Amino acid sequence: MTSDDRIKLEPIWKEALRDEFEQPYMAQLREFLRQEHAAGKEIYPPGPLIFNALNSTPLNNVKVVILGQDPYHGPNQAHGLCFSVQPGVPTPPSLVNIYKELKRDLNIDIPNHGCLQSWADQGVLLLNTTLTVERANAASHAGKGWQHFTDRIIQVVSEHQPHLVFLLWGAHAQSKQKLVDATKHLVLTSVHPSPLSAYKGFLGNGHFGRANKYLEQNGIEPIDWRLPVL
């Protein structure tokens, strides 16, 4: 992971984050990942998809930011977009609750899959704060350096343009609120959509409709939260 041409990273993101690739923490993170691979550990998502959130949603296209924590750690799940899984994989419980809220809020039919790629393509930055994980070992790469990189991503997005929507669900996502200029953006918070907490305030939060209303009020095309049938 360097800022040279070996890294597939969308050009505007690459320029905006160039200095981060030269930071000492990034060298340490590269070495950690190298050692994990050398030890035969299976790392998710696959290398080409680590930066999928950035490549799918160029900086100039960002309208909404949804923060997750770390990638799913089961086979064929993670593909670099938070809360999303690859087509053909069962929809995870938190995403089931996201779909329930979409149905309640906007009467959107619950899709038959868990792939949120169409949201990313429209300008929803689906960013995990840790971008890799070891198979079957949740949060195994937390604290290894990714948090510095993704904190900078959040800051860059906040600084880059006004009138974005940040959806911060759960304590971990809300801990990043300090990185966002709330005078320029709409910040919406609630409990996490996990089955452990969704019924304590996630279901009924109205975030998707409120996000679109804010975008429209500021002359920005809203998100079509409907997902295509796969």
Curated annotation (Swiss-Prot):
GO terms for molecular function: uracil DNA N-glycosylase activity. Keywords: Cytoplasm, DNA damage, DNA repair, Hydrolase. GO terms for biological process: base-excision repair, AP site formation via deaminated base removal. Excises uracil residues from the DNA which can arise as a result of misincorporation of dUMP residues by DNA polymerase or due to deamination of cytosine. It is an enzyme of class 3 (hydrolase). It holds the Pfam family UDG. Gene3D superfamilies: Uracil-DNA glycosylase-like domain. Its EC number is 3.2.2.27. The gene is ung. NCBIfam families: PRK05254.1-1, PRK05254.1-2, PRK05254.1-4, PRK05254.1-5, ung. The active site is at 70 (proton acceptor). Signal peptide: none annotated. Belongs to the uracil-DNA glycosylase (UDG) superfamily. UNG family. InterPro entries: UDG_fam1 (IPR002043), Ura-DNA_Glyclase_AS (IPR018085), Uracil-DNA_glycosylase-like (IPR005122), Uracil-DNA_glycosylase-like_sf (IPR036895). It is found in: Cytoplasm. GO terms for cellular component: cytoplasm. The keyword Calcium does not apply. Its main location: cytoplasm. It catalyses: Hydrolyzes single-stranded DNA or mismatched double-stranded DNA and polynucleotides, releasing free uracil. This is Uracil-DNA glycosylase.
